Each structure stands twice: as structure tokens, then as C-alpha cells.
């Protein structure tokens, strides 16, 4: 099983004139690796995976895998609210050379705990590929609780969980039920990386790493080494920047920020709309105060 730990980036999908900008994506991936990022996570929430076609997702994953060349893990977004589509997505990630697949809980149709269990076990049985479950109830309208996660872990259906509830009690419950190192525990909230790691987490799948990869890597390293004084200093320093990444629906603000760095365009795919001028101003000001060099 790949070592799912450290600072991973939920990488944006650059777009130009309505199409995926593979050149910019390759350059972003190379920059992330040069800055010390441990894993690249394409086609997730931040990568607008839900509005990419299957062919586009394949293009994105292939490009990231080709650039990474084993220098960073690739955990490819492959979820769907239809189990048969999620299976095909995971099969594609496997065939394209990803190290694991990130599979969000089924959104909109609100499955029961039993439905969630059957969803992930069906994926595992059909693919035999490492799956990181992704629990983000604010996006999906379903919360996969600790009992279901533990049941899946014990069945071998998942190798990790990206937990985006910002609940430390939830993380402690997961460790209590599953064990500290039985699966990978990855934070899905940049705001809570320090306490999450203190509660047994192994790392983060980060939005802010798209614009400040070295800072997030330093924070994760400090926390994992137990230097919580330094880690907290870094977390506090990043707080304003973290907040403005969600001043409007993500990934709008972070794509705007990537554009302000001159690394890719800010284009989003509908129904997401460009951030307002007021929000863009807040993003620019926070980046400047943080010390990022704008293009």
C-alpha cells in the first residue's frame, strides 16, 4: 500500500477557452513537486472533478502521473454518486498509473450507512485498488460516521479517509475504533491541520497548497515531528489566507489566487462563476500580506 501521508495538494484543473489546459497543469504539478509536496490529488473538489467529462478526467490524471514519475504520490479523484460510475472511475485511475483513488461519498441521493458500506465494498471488490474515502458532508448532504468508516477499514475496502468535517472529536473516534496507523487519516480542512495531526492524523489534502505549497509542507512536517509550537505559529500565519480561499465557493478563490501568481488562468467551468471584484481584492490583499509574490 502506498504511504498516504504528508502534505498533498488538491490541485486545481487549469482551463483555457473551455478546455483543460494540460500545459499549465503539467507546470503546476512540476512546481508542486519542486516545493516538496508529497502527493498530488487531481480531479477532486478543488479540481472540479464533478464537471469534467470522463475523457477529461483521464487526460488530467495521465498528465499528473507522467509528470510525477514516482516523485510524488498521485491520488486520483474518481468518485460518483452512482456506484457503477465510481467503479469505472477507479478502474481508470488504476489503468492510468495512479497510486490510489479518492472516492467521495455519494452526493445528492443520501445513502444510508448500509448503502455507503455497500458502495465502497462494491468498488473494492470490482477494482482491488487502494481507495481513500472522502467524507465532506457540506458538499454531499451525507455524513459517513465513524462506525461505517471502521466497518469499511476492517473489511479492507478503504486504505484511508479524507475527513472534511473539521471535528477533532470525529478524528479521535476514528482512531478509537480503527487504530492509529491501521489506515491513513488525512485532513480535508486547511484550518485544522495542527490539531488533526495531534489527534492521530497523517497529513492533509490541501487547497492552500495550490499557492503556498512550501508553507503547508513546513507546517505538516513540524506537526508530525511534534513541534507543535512551530506548527501552530505557521497555522496562525496562514489563517487569513485560508479564510479567503473560501470567501466564495471553492475553487473560485484559489483559482483566482493561482492566476495572481501567474501560474494558470482563473477560468472555472459552469455552474461555477468567476469570483467578484470584491472577493478578488480580498484574495490579493491576503496573498500580499502573506508575502506571496504576485505576477
UniProtKB/Swiss-Prot annotation:
One of its GO terms (cellular component) is cytosol. Pathway: Amino-acid biosynthesis; L-lysine biosynthesis via DAP pathway; (S)-tetrahydrodipicolinate from L-aspartate: step 3/4. CDD domains: DHDPS. This is 4-hydroxy-tetrahydrodipicolinate synthase. It is an enzyme of class 4 (lyase). Pyruvate binds at residues 46, 205. It catalyses: L-aspartate 4-semialdehyde + pyruvate = (2S,4S)-4-hydroxy-2,3,4,5-tetrahydrodipicolinate + H2O + H(+). It is found in: Cytoplasm. Disulfide bonds: none annotated. It comes from the Bacteria. Signal peptide: none annotated. Homotetramer; dimer of dimers.
